Every structure is written in structure tokens, then in C-alpha cells.
Curated annotation (Swiss-Prot):
It comes from the Bacteria. One of its GO terms (molecular function) is ATP binding. Keywords: Chaperone, Cytoplasm, DNA replication, Metal-binding, Repeat, Stress response, Zinc, Zinc-finger. This is Chaperone protein DnaJ. The lineage of its organism: Bacteria, Thermotogati, Thermotogota, Thermotogae, Thermotogales. One of its GO terms (biological process) is protein refolding. SUPFAM superfamilies: Chaperone J-domain, DnaJ/Hsp40 cysteine-rich domain, HSP40/DnaJ peptide-binding domain. CDD domains: DnaJ, DnaJ_C, DnaJ_zf. Participates actively in the response to hyperosmotic and heat shock by preventing the aggregation of stress-denatured proteins and by disaggregating proteins, also in an autonomous, DnaK-independent fashion. Unfolded proteins bind initially to DnaJ; upon interaction with the DnaJ-bound protein, DnaK hydrolyzes its bound ATP, resulting in the formation of a stable complex. GrpE releases ADP from DnaK; ATP binding to DnaK triggers the release of the substrate protein, thus completing the reaction cycle. Zn(2+) 2 binds at C173, C176, C199, C202.
Amino acid sequence: MKKEKKDYYEILGVPRDATQEEIKRAYKRLVKEWHPDRHPENRKEAEQRFKEIQEAYEVLSDPQKRAMYDRFGYVGEQPTYQETESGGFFDDIFREFENIFNRDIFDVFFGERPHQEERREYARRGEDIRYEIEVTLSDLINGAEIPVEYERYETCPRCGGTGVEPNAGYINCPSCGGTGRIREERRSFFGYFVSERTCERCGGTGKIPREYCHECGGSGRVLRKVRKTVKIPPNVEDGTQLRITGGGNAGYYGGPYGDLIVIVRVKPDPRFKKSGSDLVYDITIDYLQAILGTTVEVPLPEGGTTMLKIPPGTQPETVFRLKGKGLPNRYGRRGDLIVNVHVEIPKSLSREERKVLEELAKKRGVTID
């Protein structure tokens, strides 16, 4: 009977050009959906579906296995071959191959699935962690140092990241006898075959731990809360990403730490509008202040205020520029604080105010209705 080929992309419900992230998301969703414990009334079907999902993910999540699968695996409709009563020619080849090596030919292409107790252990870099931080305009004047607290995986203190229980040591891998390689020799009507591959159980090292670490379960890392201080440069732009080397998760089995990526969010200040290294501030004065002159208080981004003299006869929408009161540029030189002066004209006047203004208009020769 012919061995049914499986379309792993169809099993996970992803296109053939799916990214690793898309494959991972589909896998997580499906293993939750088809976990046998969630289908007690139809457990056998759920177990079979769950097994297929695991099998598909093991191949498609590994770039090398996926490339080999894309080249040799099942794609589209299953091809058919002319068969005799004794079975198809290619069925005989596949069956003979399995008789020789006790392995499915597709397992040779894609790699056998290790048993549950078999674990390949090699150092891998830890994942990066993304963390958003909010800063104010005052933080942008001279820069700031802001404390942050977050969770990350750190190197297991019990095993030092090896995943091995202290003093347990290693033993020769029983699968390969300590050589790190599996060699198989068989004879058939095809001739004499020699097959050699990396031992899946020890990953080619020839050794396996006698006992895995009791604290981390063999992963070499544990979850911890950490505190760090993030240095914010002056006048950083909203959305800027700062990378702190080694601030991410610990690597697997002694691998290097990932990075902490800090995304800076500048908290809007309702008093100012930011324009590069300049700040814009709008102020409204009474028409009499514009006519007679006055002094107004203007806030500064770093805190506190400064006094701005409004000369007599100031026109509406006059712009004043306070040099060096803005934000620092890339060279450390501060921009300006730009003050836009708006003049408020009253919509109604009291009888006394109107009388005074009419007398003033008469003296200045201004015609009014």
C-alpha cells in the first residue's frame, strides 16, 4: 500500500511563502485548538490531528528541513504511477529502502523526529525584548537616565546555563555509543548501502547529561525581574529605538544574551509645539496690552518661566524669538523658543468703555459709525 504524502503547508493552513512568524502563529493556534484534552468525545481524531500539526511544524520551522521538503516533498495533487498486481515500482523502492535502513525515505530527507527524551542541545542567542518608555520635553533638554523594570530570562544560577544538574556530569550517548554519528550498513538487491548521519539524541557531541537541571528543567535559563537604567540622549525623536546590548533574554544552553530594544515615546506637552530643535508657544494678550505694551510670563521646557516684554503698538500675530530657549540639536546647540502673540479684540464694550474709545477716536480723527 502506498504511503500517503502530506502537504505540511495545508496542515498548518499557511501559504508556501509564509514567514517563520506566520508559521509559528499558525502552529500555536492549531495546537491549542486540537489538543486532545479539548476533544474528549473525539480524542482519537484529535490525537491524529495534533500529531500531524506537530510533524508539519517540525519540518517547516527548520529552514534546512523546509528547503529539502520544498524540493522533494508533496506539493499539490499526489502523483500517480502505473502499478502491477505486486505493487507500484516506486512503492517497491520506498519499501526496500525502509527494509534496508528501518527508516522512512522522507525521514532521511527531513530528519527523524527525536523521541521525547532525545534532546539536541547547542548554544543559541537569546531573544530580544522590546520595551516602550515615555519621556517629557524636560528630559530632552540635557538627556535623562530613566530606571526601567521588566521580566527576562536569565542564565540559570544553579547550572550556569548548561541545563545539566550540578555534579551530574555527562555519559556517552547510548544511541551512537559516544561517536556522535549513526552508521548503518545494509545489503539489498540494489547493492551494498552505507548510511551515516548525525546522532539526533546528542546532536553530534557523543555525550548526553546524566541528569537535567532541577531549577530550569534543562533549558539553562530562568525567568527573573530586572532593573536597568536607560540613558536617553538629548532631543531624541518620538519613535526612536535604542538598543541596549545584552539587555534581552539569556541564550539557550549558555548562548549569548539578546538585546533590549527601547522605543522612546515623547509625551506631548500641551504648552508647546515641537519644530525640530525649536519650540513654538502661543500667547494671547488684550488689545489694550498690545496698544500700551506689557510684560508677560512665558514657560520654559525645562521648568520655570522667563519674562517677555511686549512693546507698545505690538500688532496681532507678531512673533518673538527667545534665543537658546528651545531644545538641543545634534551638535548640542539649543534651538529657540518662538512666541506667537495673538491679540484679543472684545466683542462687546460697556457704555463707559465705548464712551472713552469714542473720545479717543475723535481726538485721533478716526471716523466711526
